[in-house]
């Protein structure tokens, strides 16, 4: 940013800058302090750039967007081509249903993404109840690895909770890829597991806040015959939501974001 001629203050902001930059919108642990920055700037209708862990190449690439995360963010990715997607070397596996399980993925309730949703246990109950109107397929409840939730699965038929098995060599990578091998579909509000499922060819059911909304299903009415749309244009746009560290150091995402800020947010 400084190389681009911008003035940058690190941890010295008093709310008077044009733009704030924070890490994540999960108001938990060391990140909880960023909530006041978020609220100060958004209440003044000032933009906030949010940096967070990527979902295409987790722990290798990083999402950078304006005023939120996932589909709530502005990534300045309206005009794209297919070249950047190739850099990720991620195969869009053919749509398929490798198993019979419907996996409902939870999220961290301290995240700004969850602000308009009920407690996680109630959300799980709502999704199970709605699914049971249309299917008797087995349902697996999969909580967020760092967000404990209790739910009585015995009141439902063929529903069980299976927590993520965390990779001890990483912060919160899990066994999701293995779990998808038995999946018919994945249900998620807006978390990264839906993205992994789409890459793996597993249909998803998501909210408008999810980055997979464009290629996801919107209603459980078709759970026995999910839509499986073309994903290439979606992937091409997705490629401009995440960046490698060296690209960030070169100012590549900042160049796009800065122009969008000037055009749409700073007057």
Regions found by a protein language model. Give the residues of each.
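Well-ordered, non-membrane alpha-helical segments in soluble/globular domains
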Residues: 1, 30-36, 118-130
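Secretory-pathway glycan-assembly enzymes, especially type II membrane glycosyltransferases
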Residues: 1-87
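Surface-exposed cleft-lining segments at the edges of enzyme active sites
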Residues: 109-119
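Short, charged N-terminal beta->alpha structural module
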Residues: 1-9, 125-128, 148-150
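A donor-sugar binding/catalytic signature common to diverse glycosyltransferases
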Residues: 171-218
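Leloir-type glycosyltransferase catalytic cores
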Residues: 61-99, 214-267
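Catalytic donor nucleotide-activated moiety binding site of glycosyltransferases and closely related
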Residues: 128-170
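Short loop/turn segments at strand-loop or loop-helix junctions that form parts
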Residues: 23-25, 51-55, 99-111, 143-145, ...
